[in-house]
Amino acid sequence: MEKQRRSKGEAGGRGALPTYNSAVFKTVRTILLFAIFLIAGYAMATGGCADFSSKLPNVRAPLCEAAGLLDMQARSVKGRTIWGRDVAAADAGLRVLVIGGIHGDELSSASMVFHWIALAKQPMADMPMPVHWRFVPALNPDGLFSTPARRTNANGVDLNRNFPTPNWSRDARVYWESRTRKDPRRWPGPRPLSEPESRFLHGQMDSFKPNLIVSVHAPYGVLDFDGPAVPPSRLGRLYLDQVGIFPGSLGNYGGIHKRVPVVTIELPNAGRTPQDAEMRQMWLDLVRWTQDRLGSGPVEQQ
């Protein structure tokens, strides 16, 4: 009897497991799940703007939220959303794909795309060939939101060397080893289109079928061009300086192989955007060139 009494006393003492009211537990769980749902819903509704506005130069929350970014139904290596926005005239005859943030540490490239979305939404009087613009501000969100931001994606791949140019398997690794001395920032990856981010952009080229691709980079302060059509001589203060092609690059694949003109903008500073007026002038120059050189009809594609 004594042992039984002691056992019962111990069972109710310090070593006993606490008991929970199941109704309270269910209520707390429901509240937590609802809170998580609200947070996720807010992030989706604002297009990830809390993250963008805290990371990018010259991108405040109102600018980002006004962009109205949508989930492009694509994810990075780490599962981050790739956001985009279409600005399209009802009778658009041209399709232009604008990409920023291919390299995550080129923050200004993503910032300028946000400013261009705002400009694209403003009506323009002199546009005989209306345009369907598709903007992707940050193709490489894992690189962008790393601390510090880094050029490559989460797998350490330079996305601008991962496109399936002819003889990629032969040329890309040779170039990386001999010309860059195995620079890890420029590793082309184990195979072409090995990365979800480059596969997404490749898919956009196939499905959206752009007449022009604009790829925004930094920090070399020049304007590059690959493909058919007469290139723009300048955009704002950036002058044409064709620097050549690289195995696996978007310019090589899109402009040379697929025959889709690729304008590559190299902003002069990766951490700071040009002045707003300068970004506007670059936009106006791009629109005028698009109308002058591409407005007569689509460029032949392969």
Over which residues does each language-model region extend?
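Intrinsic disorder/low-complexity segments enriched in small, polar and charged residues
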Residues: 6-10
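Sec-dependent signal peptide hydrophobic core
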Residues: 28-36
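Short glycine- and acidic-rich boundary segments immediately preceding or forming the N-terminal edge
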Residues: 37-83
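Short beta-strand-to-loop junctions in surface cap/lid or active-site-entrance loops
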Residues: 84-92
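Active-site/substrate-binding loop(s) of hydrolase catalytic cores
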Residues: 93, 97, 107-242
